[in-house]
A protein has these predicted regions:
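Glycine- and small hydrophobic-enriched segments that form the cores of compact globular domains
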Residues: 84-85, 108, 131
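Conserved alpha/beta-hydrolase
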Residues: 98-119
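Short, small-residue-enriched loops and turns at beta-alpha junctions
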Residues: 86-88, 118-120
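Short strand-loop-helix active-site module centered on a catalytic nucleophile
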Residues: 64, 79, 101, 122-170
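A glycine/proline-hinged amphipathic helix-loop "lid/cap" segment
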Residues: 1-69
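Short beta-strand element of the alpha/beta-hydrolase
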Residues: 75-84
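Short glycine/serine/threonine/alanine-rich loop segments
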Residues: 41, 107, 141
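The serine-hydrolase catalytic nucleophile loop
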Residues: 88-99
């Protein structure tokens, strides 16, 4: 495991020009237009851990994947919203994280492929997450929300609305 001090992350990203497409408004618009023309695949990597199973179904217009443990009984659920700054699709590291959570905790992990900018809105993503949490509660019992970057914002927004609706999560 490589541990990088936080103070080095920003300079390292600038050095490798990781976010060069998003440095200017014009660059961001070009990248979004290119991704609309040539979408990035969002399916799971060809190989994940051997101790999980991946399934997919439709939830309205969204593909929704579930990653379930195969070596132990599934207990509980996690609804995980991937990061990507609202413009980036789910990446291999998100799949690895979901598989690790499923295998090591026994939870069934739900991964929605929510619509990205310019095709979706934060409100649509939040509403979809709320419905997926309700479904996970019915199917898997106690359910937690998780997410990173844009997905963290989606998860937090959904959690606040669920709280306001009287839904108690672990």
């Amino acid at each position: 495991v490589l541990i990088v001090p936080n103070a080095l992350v920003g300079p390292a990203l600038r050095l490798i020009r990781a976010n060069r497409a998003f440095v200017s408004e014009a660059g961001a618009r070009r990248r979004i237009r290119e991704r609309a023309l040539r979408p990035v695949p969002y399916g799971p990597p060809a190989t994940l851990r051997p101790d999980v199973r991946v399934d997919v179904e439709r939830f309205g217009d969204w593909p929704v994947y579930t990653v379930s443990p195969t070596k132990r009984a599934a207990t509980g659920g996690v609804v995980y919203a991937h990061g990507g700054g609202w413009v980036g699709e789910i990446a291999p590291q998100h799949w690895v994280l979901a598989a690790t959570i499923a295998a090591e905790t026994g939870a069934t992990v739900t991964l929605p492929i929510y619509p990205l900018v310019p095709y979706g809105t934060a409100a649509e993503a939040q509403t979809g997450m709320i419905e997926l949490v309700r479904r996970s509660l019915d199917r898997h019992g106690p359910t937690v929300l998780a997410g990173d970057s844009a997905g963290g914002q989606i998860a937090l927004s959904a959690a606040l609305r669920l709280r306001d609706d009287g839904i108690v999560l672990p």
